[in-house]
Design a protein with these regions (language model features):
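Histidine-acidic metal/acid-base catalytic patches
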Residues: 2-46, 51, 55-66, 138, ...
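Active-site acidic/histidine proton-transfer and metal-coordination neighborhood
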Residues: 13-26, 37-39, 111-210, 219
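Hydrophobic anchor at the start of a short beta-strand
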Residues: 45, 97, 180
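Short, surface-exposed acidic/glycine-rich loop or hinge patches that mediate macromolecular interfaces
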Residues: 52, 78-80, 187, 284
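Structural motif corresponding to the early beta-alpha repeats
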Residues: 71-164, 216, 246-249, 272, ...
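Glycine- and other small-residue-rich loops at beta-strand/loop junctions that grip anionic moieties
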Residues: 75, 185, 255
């Protein structure tokens, strides 16, 4: 293996020293206030698998993120990764694969005007659900569609088509114990919390909920805490990064997110679960920086 126990200790120590030498300091203002906000929701740190930028086996990668304090990971599906290797790495390291991300939902959309494309997208969602079950995950993240034009893929069409296709996967999700988690992105489809509430509730199934990314939603003008409070128990998972209206995507803790209010809202709705970073990753140094920033915001050990 690349990371034996002594190696992990070395990585932690050397990375911490490197960050100090580089003059990294926790951002002030809202981020500093977030550290002092109480009560805090109980959150567990995770990363997207694609953020782990080292060469080596799945187990090597899992060992690295574990050495940096991450408890979980989210994989893509469908993918060409060796499923047996993933399961063995999970069991060997104790890293939790808490869910998967539908890897084809953006280009092979459930809202596409072509029924054949929608059928292929549905198979992708079903594969994601099956993989999530195999890995022991609880969710399959899905972007249900995209408003691409007014004639063939407008809001109403995206709503109706995606609802129809997702319904075809609900039975499998219920049988598998895996929930379909609807994520809101910059797809011009769902831009208000009330729309996401309605979209989820229209399925009338506990197997469908919301996957919320507070940074994505800053673009649409409604505070993240408002989204969280309106979603309430519908919120299954929580992604975060950093977004600034002035500078675009920034490092975690350097954006416009009102983290103290986000933490307060998470606690109010009883969200205690995974907090998954979705940012540019890298090697040990970059991943350690991400972990440190998450710890500063969420007060995690």
């Amino acid at each position: 293996m690349y990371y034996e126990p002594s190696r992990r200790q070395f990585l932690q120590a050397s990375t911490a020293a490197a960050l100090t030498a580089a003059g990294w300091a926790a951002p002030t203002g809202r981020l500093l206030a977030a550290e002092e906000t109480k009560p805090k929701p109980k959150l567990k740190k995770a990363v997207k698998y694609g953020m782990i930028g080292i060469k080596g086996s799945v187990q090597d990668k899992f060992e690295l993120i574990k050495s940096l304090g991450f408890e979980g990971v989210e994989l893509d599906s469908p993918s060409d990764i060796n499923r047996d290797e993933v399961v063995k790495a999970r069991d060997a390291t104790g890293i939790v694969i808490h869910g998967v991300v539908d890897s084809i939902h953006w280009n092979v959309r459930l809202s596409d005007p072509d029924a054949a494309v929608r059928a292929k997208g549905l198979e992708g969602l079903k594969t994601a659900i099956k993989d999530a079950k195999l890995y022991g995950g609880t969710t399959a993240l899905l972007v249900p569609g995209k408003v691409s034009n007014k004639e063939t893929e407008n809001y109403e069409q995206v709503y109706e088509r995606s609802q129809a296709e997702v319904r075809k996967a609900i039975g499998l999700a219920e049988e598998s114990g895996v929930k379909i988690a609807i994520e809101v992105v910059w797809n011009d489809f769902i831009t208000k919390p009330e729309q996401l509430v309605q979209y989820v509730d229209d399925f009338k199934s506990p197997a469908v909920g919301a996957y919320f990314d507070c940074s994505n939603m800053l673009k649409y003008g409604v505070p993240a805490a408002t989204w969280i409070r309106k979603l309430g128990p519908r919120m299954l998972k929580f992604d975060f990064k950093g977004y600034s209206a002035k500078n675009g995507w920034v490092k975690i803790g350097e954006g416009d997110e009102d983290w103290p209010e986000v933490l307060k809202a998470l606690d109010e709705v009883g969200y205690h679960g995974w907090a998954t970073a979705e940012v540019s990753g890298g090697g040990p140094k970059e991943l350690q920086d991400i972990a440190t920033r998450m710890n500063k915001i969420f007060g995690l050990g």
